[in-house]
Regions:
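Positively charged n-region of N-terminal signal peptides that target proteins for export
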Residues: 1-5
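N-terminal signal peptide c-region/cleavage motif recognized by signal peptidases
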Residues: 13-15
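Acidic/histidine-rich, surface-exposed loop or edge segments in extracytoplasmic proteins
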Residues: 18-33, 87-102
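N-terminal secretory signal peptides
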Residues: 19-66
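Extracellular/luminal Pro/Thr/Ser-rich low-complexity repeat and linker "mucin-like" segments
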Residues: 35-41, 101-110
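Ser/Thr-rich, low-complexity intrinsically disordered terminal regions
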Residues: 46, 52-84, 91-106, 116-145
């Protein structure tokens, strides 16, 4: 009986689709090399996924700046679920970064990798040219639900 109720709840609640991203960010921008702590990269990835509607998120990072002062590119792997698009609503989302929220190249890379996996997002406007770590970036997105 419990199994039937659980199956019914899953069918009624709609479908979810498992997604994942995996990439390495080398940190080359503006003629400079940038390195990041994995905790920062994981937090940024998690926050963008949540903003774009992901659930059941698992983000893993390797490399980066470690306790022994080792500095390597960061490799990110994330798995997450996205709900099926029902087409009943659209949400406008803006993502902005400026000099006070640096790491332009890293943040733009994370956003672009996530967007590659989403069919329900339309990019209306973007400024993603990161000449420097402190460059501004901007994405204006329509997200269908």
């Amino acid at each position: 009986m419990k199994t039937a109720a659980l199956l019914f709840a899953l069918i009624v609640s709609g479908s979810v689709f498992a997604k994942n991203i995996s990439f390495t960010y080398f940190g080359n921008q503006g003629g400079n090399q940038s390195y990041y702590a994995c905790s920062y990269v994981e937090d940024q990835t998690q926050s963008y996924l949540e903003l774009l509607g992901a659930t059941n998120i698992d983000v893993r990072c390797s490399g980066g700046i470690s306790g022994g002062w080792s500095m390597q590119p960061v490799s990110i792997r994330a798995s997450y679920d996205m709900a099926e698009v029902t087409g009943t609503s659209v949400e406008l989302v803006e993502i902005k970064g400026d000099y006070s929220n640096s790491a332009c190249g890293l943040n733009v890379k994370i956003i672009k990798e996530i967007l590659k996996t989403l069919t329900n997002v339309e990019v209306l406007k973007k400024d993603d040219s990161c000449a420097f770590v402190t460059s501004n970036y901007y994405f204006k997105l329509n997200i269908a639900h």
